[in-house]
Amino acid sequence: MLIFCALLGFSKSSIAQSMPFGDYNTSFITPLSAQLNRYDFYPVSKSTGTTNINIPLFSIPTPDDTQISFNLSYHSSGIKVEDPVGILGYGWSILPGLRITRMQFGKVDEHCKLLPLNYNTSIFPRSYWARPNTDEEAIWGYDGEHDIFFINTIDQNTSFIIEKNNNCFTAKQIKQTPLKIEVIGTAEGFKVTDDQGVVYIYGGNSDYTIETSACKQVYLLKEIIYTDSQKISFNYGREIIKTSTPTQSHKLVYTTSNDWEIISVNNPVVQGDCILKSITFPLGKVTYEYHSSRKEILKNIKIYGNNSQLIKTISFITDTNKNLLQSVTIPGSGKYSFEYNPTTFENVYAQDLYGYYTGKKNATYIDMIPQNTVLKALNKNIGNARSSVESAMQANILQKIVYPTGGYVSFEYEKNQAINPIDNSIVICGLRLKQMNIYTPENNQTVSKTYKYGNNESGYGKLVTLPSDWDYWIQRKRYDLSDMSYTGYIYEIISQSSLNILYRNSYLIWYDEVAEYTPAGKTVEKYNYQYNQGGSGFVSEFWQMLYHKPYIIDRKVYKGNNVQEHTEYEYYEDELSYIMGISVRSNLYYPSSEPDIPIHLNKICHDKEIAGIFSPTVNGNMISGDTDSNPDFTIDNYAIHTGLFRLGRKTTRLYDDEAVPYEISEEYLYSDNLLYNMTGTLSCTSLGDSIYTRYYYPSDGYPGYPQTICDLLSQRNLSTTVIATEQTKISGSKQSLISGKKVIYDSIPGDYTRMYPVKTYYKNKLQPDFRQENQRTYYPFGKLATETGRNGVST
């Protein structure tokens, strides 16, 4: 079975590299995290021109009588030249991802002091710039920026920061969820409890963490502990993750002020990561087997029963030369085969400004040097080498999936494009889905879905952020600090933008309108993604952590030229607040503010710790914020936008060729205390009657409900448990009961974390008082023993 759906997804980071990116203030995640987090930061939606492709692989039973499902997933946003290959080839991942990933901003949060917001930003002490191993400081100094952590349990995800209070670390969520997140030690790991009392342990020791840039970047899921103390354990192995192409950079080395040479550097993308080796659960085990020659490429997944009997083997065939998954065979389902665009990456330099392949033979990175700099002598090398080529951008992209039934789905792509509002230039970044063709062998028919993008099908979207050539420069190094001449300066040009790095290659273009054409007609959806800062006075650099993706505001379904169905959406923003911070950047292209250094060389350099090497003016004489005075630093107040963003109302009008439409309106109400709890729905129709459904939670209480039970449910993080429901019909000013339900929960021997339903009561219009319908008893650790109905009969 193959499932296509528009889901809340993720974007990936530019791949981690040892050399040119080693001194960035923004850290890099590992290759597998990069692939997994693509779904976090490049949301799968029509508004981004993507479709999510999921193939169910297997499920394992859990002690709480549910299942954990694992899926093979492909992200259709395009393959960049420097993308990590992962364990199955370009574009493919196995979800869920089973890890927490840190995005480091500034310095590592657990090893430095938080810079106060009221700090005198015109004078910075040397301690702010202290580096981990400097001889001058015993500490790392201050840090004004928050590292952001991204977590995925089996069915929930969120992002959070850590804060230090009284030498203890606590987690603060950016988007509120029922998850309870606890920091283990000095961010050695995390304990996460979901709203059913299930505990997830991430990290904790070196076997379950991956360290880069002097801090823990990845925390692997170690175990899931259920309320009856049974566990599911995960075991990993460390392997080298590669790509078929090395990352490239140019170094412009000045030997004198007028003489320089270009050194091109190949940086093989070879980095360790942890790959899943086995999963042990109470009723069996899952093992992951990898190729002998490419130990990071997955070959088989084997599922065993509790008697070690092999139940089934899922086989993957990957072309290890092209790094493309060819097929997967799943017992009980059959074989899925995959076909790709035949264009491959022949020249690593052949990348556009966003890392997509251009196919050009003699391409270099030199052409993107800004022409208004001292390096204008390099203009002789500037060409059009990094402009995008639509056909080449499709290199290695998935084009067809053949089902076990003989049916197939094929994909056609086109370039993502938007108009830069600053200079009206056209920005091209990545691919969008143009057409999807679905063939069904049972009726020998092919159904096509075609997509048109932009307002009134203009073909152009909107930019999330403005691109800049300067984002492709990284730090300069000076070998002789006593020499104030040009000697020893090194400029580096990297292959991918630091904005791609900063936002983990998040999507640059989104569409406010998308039309889907099918043989039955068309559907037009409108989206919004304009963030209203609300007068906070801070630049909210991380608002997308809360809003996550463009959200639908309008949907029309057409039959011919006539609208058959029209739905409008309204949203709530609740408990909006800001996690404040201070972002500090060195403006130094040269390690000095000496007047003999030309002012025009003093460009922003996206690097803070360079100041700790070059010793800028810090003893009260520093100038900041005035580019005409050769400033050493630029200081920006910023905020991480937090709260909860949810659907508030949905109104649908059904025309059905009638002059007066039939209207259905649904309003969604939420708790004032726990914003993620929906307390009610109000459904209204144009006929006049309304249905109000009210949900009660432990924090709300309910007349006649034992308060001790409510307190226990809240204490055990079971705050989303519905204890009672009432449904009422509203006709004008009259209200009448339709039905009601009340469930009494209690603890049972052997399981003092979870609460179990022991009695259920019902009422309705004819029986307005609650009447017990059934009663349950349990064996120790939660297995149902008996259920007795209202008639006294037990099973």
Which residues fall in each region the model found?
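Beta-strand elements of repeat-based all-beta scaffolds
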Residues: G189-V192, K222-I225, T243, L276-T280, ...
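Glycine-centered tight beta-turn/hairpin loop motif at sheet-sheet or coil-to-beta transitions
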Residues: P63-D65, D155-N157, Q176-P178, T193-G197, ...
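Long, intrinsically disordered, low-complexity, charged/polar and glycine-rich segments
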Residues: Q17-K222, Y226-S229, V265-N267, V348-A392, ...
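Glycine- and acidic-residue-rich phosphate-binding/metal-coordinating active-site segment common to enzymes
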Residues: K216-L221, I225-N300, N306
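Bacterial Sec-dependent N-terminal signal peptides
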Residues: M1-M19
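Extended serine/threonine-enriched, polar tracts that run as long, contiguous segments within proteins
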Residues: S278-S333, V660, L675
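Outer-membrane beta-barrel pore domains and translocons
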Residues: S73-H75, G237-E239, N416, P698
